[in-house]
Curated annotation (Swiss-Prot):
Homodimer. Signal peptide: none annotated. GO terms for cellular component: cytoplasm. It comes from Methanothermobacter thermautotrophicus (strain ATCC 29096 / DSM 1053 / JCM 10044 / NBRC 100330 / Delta H). Pathway: Purine metabolism; IMP biosynthesis via salvage pathway; IMP from hypoxanthine: step 1/1. Gene3D superfamilies: 3.40.50.2020. InterPro entries: HGPRTase-like (IPR026597), PRibTrfase_dom (IPR000836), PRTase-like (IPR029057), Pur/Pyrimidine_PRTase (IPR050118). The gene is hpt. The lineage of its organism: Archaea, Methanobacteriati, Methanobacteriota, Methanomada group, Methanobacteria. PANTHER family: HYPOXANTHINE/GUANINE PHOSPHORIBOSYLTRANSFERASE (PTHR43864), XANTHINE PHOSPHORIBOSYLTRANSFERASE (PTHR43864:SF1). Its main location: cytoplasm. Keywords: Cytoplasm, Glycosyltransferase, Purine salvage, Transferase. This is Hypoxanthine/guanine phosphoribosyltransferase. It is found in: Cytoplasm. Its EC number is 2.4.2.8. It holds the Pfam family Pribosyltran.
Length: 193
């Protein structure tokens, strides 16, 4: 199960961004080539394990977009993108986020108080992006039903749970050891479910 995902992760090059070990993968970076079978495998497993039920899927630019697109097609749930640029639309909410390798503003549009949402992203590592978005959604009185990432790396899921109460559900856990990506299964019903 998830053979394509695991293989792509194990074959990922690792680069340094400051002190941060960053793996380059189609799921998290869109490079090298992102095969449709990989995206389909990921979306099918998300649907099988987590059965998203919501009015909207919220994804985070940029690498949450392709996961939200395929998940939307599989479930019929529309999606909205938390963007990295301001549009100035009525009701737009600005969010400041910090990760292990970047910092900046995110902008939430198309989400209203009372909306039932599933938040999807490619990876949780430091938790900085998810923390910022989840705190903003809470302040907006949005009903967050689930928080799902394809990959869990580092301590981010624990940080998100401790600071927000939300459990980040992921398909696999990875770590970078000696410049290589190590992949660990998170079984259905496991610690993130």
């Amino acid at each position: 199960m998830l053979d394509k995902l695991k293989e792509s992760l194990r074959n990922s090059p690792v680069i340094k961004k400051g002190e941060y070990d960053y793996f380059v993968n189609p799921v998290t970076d869109g490079i090298p080539l992102t095969e449709p079978e990989l995206l389909e495998e990921v979306a099918e497993e998300i649907v099988r394990r987590f059965r998203p039920e919501a009015d909207k899927i919220i994804c985070i630019e940029a690498m949450g977009i392709h996961h939200a697109t395929v998940l939307s097609l599989k479930t019929g749930i529309p999606f909205v993108v938390v963007r990295k640029r301001r549009y100035g639309l009525p009701g737009e909410v600005a969010v400041h986020q910090m990760t292990g390798y970047s910092e900046g503003e995110l902008y939430i549009n198309g989400v209203d108080s009372g909306d039932r949402v599933v938040v999807i992203d490619d990876v949780v590592s430091t938790g900085g992006t998810l923390l910022a978005v989840l705190e903003a959604l809470r302040e907006m009185d949005v009903d967050v039903r689930d928080v799902i990432t394809v990959i869990d790396k580092g301590e981010g899921s624990r940080v998100v749970r401790e600071r927000t109460g939300f459990t980040v559900k992921s398909l696999v856990k990875v770590d970078v050891i000696d410049g290589r990506v190590k992949v660990e299964d998170i079984p259905a019903g496991g610690p993130h479910d």
